[in-house]
Amino acid sequence: MDIDRGIRVAVDTGNVILGSKRTIQSLKLGKGKLVVMASNIPEDLKEDIEYYAKLSEIPVYTHEGTSVELGSVCGKPFTVGALLIQDPGDSTILEMVG
């Protein structure tokens, strides 16, 4: 299973938070297992996500694609700058990037 497929399976079968702001809010609470960021996420959001993820000891993966491509991988008709996987469901994404 490749990374894109792992993300899609997690979105379809698990519990995933989409969006930079909601991801940061959950990171502040220490919730989540993996953060996935788009390659073109704004630098200020990237720094915030990396900071709060480090405090919560949650790994961060930077997706090769843009936010448009990450949204498409998630099966959404909008851009996704970042997402937080709380429960991967049937996906093996945590093993792939961890």
Curated annotation (Swiss-Prot):
UniProt GO molecular function = RNA binding; structural constituent of ribosome
Q: Which GO terms describe its cellular component?
A: cytosolic large ribosomal subunit
Q: Which residues form the signal peptide?
A: none
- SUPFAM superfamilies in the record: L30e-like
Q: Which UniProt keywords apply?
A: Ribonucleoprotein, Ribosomal protein
Choose any GO biological process term that the UniProt entry carries and state it.
translation
NCBIfam families associated with the record: PRK01018.1 (NF002172)
The UniProt entry's sequence similarity note says:
Belongs to the eukaryotic ribosomal protein eL30 family.
Q: Which PANTHER family match?
A: RIBOSOMAL PROTEIN L30 (PTHR11449)
UniProt name for this protein: Large ribosomal subunit protein eL30
Q: Which organism is it from?
A: Methanothermobacter thermautotrophicus (strain ATCC 29096 / DSM 1053 / JCM 10044 / NBRC 100330 / Delta H) (Methanobacterium thermoautotrophicum)
